[in-house]
């Protein structure tokens, strides 16, 4: 049995707003043989804070078929990943910072680059 790949974030809740396309979002379970993001990596410092990526497995893994207009909230610590994307899935990822880890006025460095 092949397990889908995914990631979990130690402290970061994410909200996905599906703006076009769709696929199957896998949540739950646990990350097996995961790789922790390095303390100075972009994943940790810019994107999601400390995270762990690898295969997702376990009896509580749930597959959600999502489509344009769906909104999904993924709590911190919950493994998640994509599978069965037939064409594409575009989504807006919202990552709130209720603990105010980021400095006031923070702008993601990727947003400072021209498109």
Residue ranges and their predicted role:
Residues 10-25, 29, 40-53:
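Short, conserved beta-strand element in jelly-roll/cupin
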Residues 34-66:
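Double-stranded beta-helix
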Residues 12, 19-22, 27-31, 78-79, ...:
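A mature extracytoplasmic/lumenal domain signature
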Residues 6-7, 14-17, 63-64, 71-72:
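His/acidic/aromatic-lined binding-pocket segments of jelly-roll/cupin-type domains
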Residues 87-105:
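A short hydrophobic beta-strand segment most commonly corresponding to one strand
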Residues 103-115:
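Extracytoplasmic/periplasmic copper-protein system
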Residues 65-85:
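Conserved metal-binding segment of the jelly-roll/cupin
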Residues 1-6, 11, 59:
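N-terminal post-signal-peptidase region of extra-cytosolic proteins
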């Amino acid at each position: 049995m092949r397990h889908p790949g995914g990631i979990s974030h130690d402290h970061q809740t994410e909200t996905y707003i599906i703006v076009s396309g769709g696929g199957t979002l896998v949540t739950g379970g646990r990350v097996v043989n995961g790789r922790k993001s390095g303390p100075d990596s972009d994943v940790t410092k810019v994107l999601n804070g400390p995270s762990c990526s690898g295969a997702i497995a376990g009896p509580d893994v749930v597959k959600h078929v999502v489509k344009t207009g769906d909104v999904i909230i993924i709590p911190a610590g919950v493994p998640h990943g994509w599978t069965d994307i037939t064409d594409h899935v575009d989504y807006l990822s919202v990552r709130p910072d209720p603990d105010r880890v980021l400095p006031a006025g923070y702008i993601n460095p990727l947003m400072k680059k021209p498109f």
